[in-house]
């Protein structure tokens, strides 16, 4: 394979991915294709009337990478011509590669998976009502209105040209059919579940995470927050304020704080990468000098890292507006605006190593085709709140009606009904669920964490891969 690659005019590295199974991997440098860009785009315009001249931002880089990957696939298929070849393309970013194969290697069977539609995400992200008017939306017209014509067009073409078209949930299947004009099959997202969170090593990780979370909260707010007594909540994900439910996360905490009379500190962590300017030196110093006395909260106690746009950041403004940065309140919010890769300079733990220390996660999403974050949460034994507008939420709601979850007194996944218009009711429900979780005994919490892990195992790739096998059968 390596001997034949130079003729492609692309720089390629071969190796193995360092995960279980060590699958072979090809890394391709697509930069040489920049000089061919106009020719490649013209070829696809002739074949499909694809208007790539309307693309902007990451359109060109995504498209050229997709074509480079498709050329590698074409080469591999020719090398192993006696075998049936299947090429899988995910999202609009790789869609042009599928179109390239249709022109240059039509014998390769293709699967196109959209994990969200370009137009659907844009409608939701622009504060328009996606679900009330879903059956009336025209994908092409909305793409023009929202300025995403090229991305939508290549995505729609791939959906129609693919041997099999798929998406990740029933929720998004309806959206894809309406906006892209072809009904997809559903391939739900699985997860490698791994070790139980109730084993000794995982419990040790949980203890370490809680000690760190307590220390950070204590230093930011200038008071002792005992990790053994505190109740830790988190939301993680992309900084899509409405789509990911960050707005409702803060509003629900505010609503809860207004009536909370308990003695336990409730600390909510917003784990969302933003325009981070680096770790706080004052916080770093205090964390590394535990004997240093402190009588007052730090400036901007809701921030673990500095931001370039602190005064204008939407989450910071919202937190301050709702008084969730007050040291005298039992309910506090801490915004962690960095990528949690274990090297952020303050927490220095990965996202998963922090997640295991939480008592509850909240993902009140408005637009969530699947929703890995609540699935990741229960994999680590942390109960979660999600909504009926998340594909995972609908799956979990259905799964929890079966044994052994139907009889469980405290379900690990709370699925809150959310629509375009019921925001006050959603906030009220999330607030009451926080209170309910706080009231559980240690034994009830332990049983709920156990059920959370058991539910996560129902979404293991070992079980969900059968959906892919069924898709491959359709390609014969």
PLM features: residue spans?
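Catalytic cores of nucleotide-sugar-dependent glycosyltransferases that transfer UDP/GDP/TDP-activated
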Residues: 1-476
């Amino acid at each position: 394979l390596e001997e034949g690659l130079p003729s492609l005019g692309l720089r390629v590295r071969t190796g193995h991915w360092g995960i279980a199974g060590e699958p072979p991997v090809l890394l391709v440098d697509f930069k040489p294709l920049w000089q061919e860009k106009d020719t490649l785009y013209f070829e696809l315009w002739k074949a499909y009337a694809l208007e790539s001249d309307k693309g902007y931002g990451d359109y060109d880089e995504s498209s050229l990478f997709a074509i480079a990957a498709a050329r590698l696939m074409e080469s591999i298929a020719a090398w192993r011509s006696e075998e049936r070849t299947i090429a899988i393309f995910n999202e609009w970013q790789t869609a042009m590669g599928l179109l390239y194969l249709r022109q240059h290697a039509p014998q390769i069977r293709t699967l196109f998976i959209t994990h969200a539609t370009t137009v659907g995400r844009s409608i939701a992200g622009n504060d328009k009502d996606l679900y009330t008017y879903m059956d009336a939306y025209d994908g092409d017209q909305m793409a023009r209105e929202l300025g995403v014509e090229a991305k939508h067009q290549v995505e729609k073409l791939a959906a129609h040209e693919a041997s099999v078209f798929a998406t990740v949930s029933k929720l998004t299947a309806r959206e894809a059919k309406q906006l892209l004009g072809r009904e997809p099959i559903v391939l739900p997202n699985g997860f490698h579940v791994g070790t139980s969170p109730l084993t000794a090593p995982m419990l040790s990780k949980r203890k370490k995470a809680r000690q760190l979370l307590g220390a950070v909260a204590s230093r930011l707010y200038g008071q002792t927050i005992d990790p053994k007594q505190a109740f830790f909540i988190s939301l993680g994900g992309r900084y899509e304020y409405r789509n990911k439910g960050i707005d409702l996360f803060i509003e629900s905490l505010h609503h809860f704080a207004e009536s909370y009379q308990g003695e336990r500190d409730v600390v909510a962590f917003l784990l969302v990468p933003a325009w981070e300017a680096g770790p706080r030196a004052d916080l770093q110093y205090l964390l590394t000098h535990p004997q240093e006395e402190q009588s007052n909260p730090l400036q901007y106690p809701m921030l673990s890292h500095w931001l370039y746009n602190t005064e204008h950041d939407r989450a910071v403004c919202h937190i301050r507006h709702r008084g969730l940065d007050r040291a005298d309140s039992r309910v506090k919010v801490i915004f962690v605006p960095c990528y949690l890769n274990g090297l952020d300079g303050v927490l220095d733990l990965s996202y998963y190593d922090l997640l295991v220390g939480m008592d509850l996660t909240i993902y009140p999403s408005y637009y969530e085709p699947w929703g890995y974050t609540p699935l990741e949460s229960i994999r680590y034994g942390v109960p979660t709140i999600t909504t009926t507008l998340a594909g995972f939420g609908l799956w979990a709601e259905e799964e929890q009606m079966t044994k052994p979850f139907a009889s469980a007194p405290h379900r690990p996944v709370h699925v809150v009904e959310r629509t375009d218009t019921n925001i006050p009711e959603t906030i009220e429900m999330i607030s009451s669920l926080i209170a309910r979780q706080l009231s559980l005994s240690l034994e009830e919490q332990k049983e709920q964490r156990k059920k959370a892990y058991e539910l996560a195992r129902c979404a293991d790739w070992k079980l969900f891969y059968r959906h892919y096998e069924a898709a491959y059968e359709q390609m014969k």
